[in-house]
UniProtKB/Swiss-Prot annotation:
Has the structural arrangement of an alpha-helix connected to antiparallel beta-sheets by disulfide bonds (CS-alpha/beta). Belongs to the long (3 C-C) scorpion toxin superfamily. Sodium/Potassium channel inhibitor family. Residues 25-80 form the LCN-type CS-alpha/beta domain. Keywords: Disulfide bond, Ion channel impairing toxin, Neurotoxin, Secreted, Signal, Toxin. InterPro entries: LCN-type_CS_alpha_beta_dom (IPR044062), Scorpion_toxin-like_sf (IPR036574), Scorpion_toxinL/defensin (IPR002061). This is Toxin Acra I-3. Expressed by the venom gland. The keyword Metal-binding does not apply. Disulfide bonds join C40-C63, C49-C68, C53-C70. One of its GO terms (cellular component) is extracellular region.
Length: 80
């Protein structure tokens, strides 16, 4: 029983460390030529969002809240 509790605590700590590490990555939602955010349907890693982000000048993006999010996208590069 004690081993199970210890294992659970370790798993929770590693989960928290992972979420804290990823939370500090700046970015932005890119906008199309009409000023709309790009929609996406597959949350997380998403090739269409990566392609959109590359058009906006950054290397990586993903689907978050059913909209494409680009890591390190600066305000000046949000619109095409």
């Amino acid at each position: 029983m004690m081993k199970l509790v210890l294992l659970s605590v370790i798993v929770i700590l590693f989960s928290l460390i992972g979420s804290i590490h990823g939370a500090n990555v700046p970015g932005n939602y890119p906008l199309d030529s009409s000023g709309n955010k790009y929609p996406c349907t597959v949350l997380g890693d998403n090739q269409s969002c990566i392609d959109v982000c590359k058009k906006h000048g950054v290397k990586y993006g993903y689907c978050y809240g059913f909209k494409c999010w680009c890591e390190y996208l600066k305000d000046k590069n949000v619109s095409l």
